[in-house]
From Swiss-Prot:
Keywords: ATP-binding, Glycerol metabolism, Kinase, Nucleotide-binding, Phosphoprotein, Transferase. The gene is glpK. InterPro entries: ATPase_NBD (IPR043129), Carb_kinase_FGGY (IPR000577), Carb_kinase_FGGY_CS (IPR018483), FGGY_C (IPR018485), FGGY_N (IPR018484), Glycerol_kin (IPR005999). This is Glycerol kinase. The modification Phosphohistidine is found at residue 232. It comes from Streptococcus pyogenes serotype M4 (strain MGAS10750).
Length: 508
């Protein structure tokens, strides 16, 4: 009797690594998770030890096998999904990183980004990469490492150093240094990749003095990149055949294969990605243009809007204000509110993300009266998440010219039924919650399985992650627009408040 076969997804995140084993129905059979240390050398700096990431991945691979009694020989293929933009530079011969991994959130390279803007490169970089110039992306992180590690620039020019985002690092380690590759979605977040020509951009590389030899080969999101070295996969030589950055993997896991399909992951922040098809559309409203995925020689582009504060606003109610004891309680409190939704919370704790990109804005509250209750405040905080999502969705519709009919949702806060119903109401469209909320890992598994024939084609996947619950808009148009106008006024007032402060500082 032949053994049943499975797909393993390695989900390497910002604070932890996970390995999840899926069966042919797309069901989770086993999983293992391990956190690893965050390193904060200075205020605003965030780093990881790349070897600790690798150790955590080895640990969770073992954990997933132990929990399920599945053997390495039963794994048909491996898919990898990862925290995007985080940058590792290592010695080609020894495989030892020359510096910590600089994490996507880290602001230590902001002066390099500011210099690029001052030197007038914003338009050129936006047109080629689809991105805004920011320390968020990998390019400035590579430049920082080459500047700050003695002899690094010279070694890079001699071909002695390699660069990779976390997907690249893990494939390099799993194959014991045999394969140095990345995929379209991760390359598109480096600020070095020309997403129109699908090549590393020589002009940007020259501008930043980054040797091209350091960079990995860019591959599609679904093909066999190499096989695991047996001693790194508990005796198994298994194809690694799917890769995508976490948000793009979620787009694929949500089966958003057609232009105009949109997914939103409600995590700590909120990441909204729209499939725009095979045409690259540059945003004129501060959204990012990126690559959603590329399979079989065809690339699907995407528009992305990032909201800084979503689920973390609920954590603030719990840990900061002590208004609730657990995050799920926020739903009960909000449903108990009897207010007419006149309170607005603008959770700009670290500034405002898309489409405002106002890093100076700070959190504010409007519309309080003597009768405002704790329940009203909790409801207003939940509603702020939905209002921010509408800001991005409206912008996406303008940029793309596509009329969005449905929003596919996943992530922790998507379990809040009150929030999902209000989201449907304020957008005036259906909200489809994924039945399987493991959409990021599932997307990586789908990409890997397609490449080895575990699933026949993309049509076969459509049966596997059916919609869980559908939330339909039920609010009348005039009330919906009245509430949203109030939100826009609150955001404007928030921005004016910090602008006035800046003006006062300048006057001094």
């Amino acid at each position: 009797m032949s053994q049943e076969k499975y797909i393993m997804a390695i989900d390497q995140g910002t604070t932890s690594s996970r390995a999840i084993i899926f069966n042919q129905k797309g069901e989770k059979v086993s999983s293992s998770q391990k956190e690893f240390p965050q390193i904060f050398p200075h205020a605003g700096w965030v780093e990881h030890n790349a070897n600790q990431i690798w150790n955590s991945v080895q640990s969770v691979i073992a954990g997933a096998f132990i929990e399920s009694s599945i053997k390495p020989s039963q794994i048909e293929a491996i898919g990898i999904t990862n925290q995007r933009e985080t940058t590792v530079v290592w010695d080609k011969k020894t495989g030892v990183p020359i510096y910590n991994a600089i994490v996507w959130q880290s602001r230590q390279t902001a002066p390099i980004a500011e210099q690029l803007k001052e030197d007038g490169h914003t338009k050129m970089i936006h047109e080629k990469t689809g991105l805004v110039i920011d320390a968020y992306f990998s390019a400035t992180k590579i430049r920082w490492i080459l500047d700050h590690v003695p002899g690094a620039q010279e070694r890079a020019e001699k071909g002695e150093l390699l660069f990779g985002t976390i997907d690249t690092w893990l494939v390099w380690k799993l194959t014991d240094g045999a394969v140095h590759v990345t995929d379209y979605s991760n390359a598109a977040r480096t600020m070095l990749y020309n997403i129109k020509d699908l090549t590393w951009d020589d002009e940007i590389l020259e501008l930043l003095n980054i040797p091209k030899d350091m960079l990995p080969e860019v591959k599609s999101n679904s093909e066999i990149y190499g096989k695991t070295a047996a001693f790194h996969f508990y005796g198994g030589e298994v194809p690694i055949s799917g890769m995508a950055g976490d948000q793009q993997a979620a787009l694929f896991g949500q089966l958003a294969f057609e232009p105009g399909m949109v997914k939103n992951t409600y995590g700590t922040g909120s990441f909204i990605i729209m499939n725009t098809g095979d045409e690259m559309q540059l945003s004129s409203n501060n959204l990012l243009t990126t690559i959603g995925y590329g399979i079989g020689g065809k690339v699907h582009y995407a528009l992305e809007g990032s909201i800084f504060i979503a689920g973390s606003a609920i954590q603030w109610l719990r840990d900061g204000l002590k208004m609730i004891e657990t995050s799920p309680e926020s739903e009960q409190f909000a449903l108990a509110s009897t207010s007419d939704d006149e309170v607005y919370v603008v959770p700009a704790f670290t500034g405002l993300g898309a489409p405002y990109w106002d890093s100076n804005a700070r959190g504010s509250v409007f519309g309080l009266t003597r009768g405002t209750s704790k329940e009203d405040f909790v409801k207003a905080t939940l509603q702020s998440i939905a209002y921010q999502v509408r800001d991005v969705i409206d912008t996406m519709q303008v940029d793309s010219g596509i009329d969005i009919q449905q929003l596919r949702v996943d992530g922790g806060a998507a379990m809040n039924n009150m929030l999902m119903q209000f989201q449907a109401d304020i957008l005036g469209i259906d909200i489809a919650r994924a039945k399987n909320l493991e959409t990021t890992a599932l997307g990586a598994a789908f990409l890997a399985g397609l490449a080895v024939g575990y699933w026949e084609d993309m049509d076969a996947l459509k049966e596997l992650n059916a919609t869980g619950q559908l939330f339909k808009a039920s609010m009348n148009e005039s009330r919906k627009e009245k509430l949203y106008k109030g939100w826009k006024r609150a955001v404007k007032a928030t921005q004016v408040f910090t602008q006035e402060e800046d003006a006062d500082d300048d006057a001094k």
